[in-house]
Amino acid sequence: MTGTPPPGQARVQTRITVPDPQIMVNLLGAGDEILRLVEQSLASDVHVRGNEITITGVPSDNAVAERLFSELLELIAKGETLTTDAVRRTVGMLAQGGSERPADVLTLNILSRRGRTIRPKTLGQKRYVDAIDAHTIVFGIGPAGTGKTYLAMAKAVQALQAKQVNRIILTRPAVEAGERLGFLPGTLYEKIDPYLRPLYDALHDMLDPDSIPKLMAAGTIEVAPLAYMRGRTLNDAFIILDEAQNTTAEQMKMFLTRLGFGSRIVVTGDITQVDLPGGTSSGLRTVRDILTGLDDVHFAQLSSTDVVRHRLVSDIVDAYARWDADREAQQNQGVHAVQGRTAQGGRANRRR
């Protein structure tokens, strides 16, 4: 991507030598697809000849290009085959700044099973995972597709396998049923299964499916609606509350006070997707005001830059955020206008 240099800055050349032909093949990608994506991402021009990469641009742009190539070469050195997704993630992380190296973020293994590795894919996800390691209670708040629940469950399985905890407890509010499961037909399992199915699906990604029924029968893994947490003290457990935006303030307090010795809690949710009845305030909204600043409690905020689903999902999240902000601004203007007319009417009445 060629740009006009800023006034007073001359374009210069920077060269990077890649001594191993196989590394260069990986760096360029099949049909040069990686190279084309890199060129689109940079303000400097990039040309490759033999084992040499020539970067042409103003010094500041060249420095960005050098950093990008350095990270991509580090990924290759760590045994990775470059993909367009890895390049986009690296470009995004470099644009955000921060002290973390993208190559380190993208190669941080949480769990591996049958050749599939679960890793953070963004800076926000890496910081979220680090917070889970460092704090007893962590809130993961962000839009759909940011890996809030999936990464929390991966950390729970990792902790169980490392014998840091004795059991995993997964819960979510069955708000669609009003948590009045007794009014639904069928056994308890049949009643709660539709609401907890996403948690089972994630478990099947992380554990041998044949072992899951045995672990559940032994109480090592428990999946239950939030209402079933009341009155318990949960020791030596990794506890995850999913869809926490659909808890009331009272339910959130009840859940957090289940914490026992040797346990950790991760609470996940998206405050833009509240399904509670009108007028009911979300416990996930209020808990931040109540617990911010409390020792050993951390709030991790994920955003559209952390979405790891289809690239359109990130754009959709941003579009809805803009729409919500515009609607809120219009509502506020309407309130101010009504207040202004009311005040003027009051003054007119007093003059009469």
Where would I find each of the regions flagged by the language model?
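Interdomain "pre-motor" coupling segment immediately N-terminal to P-loop NTPase/helicase cores
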Residues: 47-105
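Short glycine-/aliphatic-rich beta-strand segments at the starts of folded cytosolic domains
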Residues: 7-26
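N-terminal assembly/transducer modules of large multi-domain enzymes
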Residues: 40-42, 49
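N-terminal intrinsically disordered, cationic/polar leader segments
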Residues: 2-3
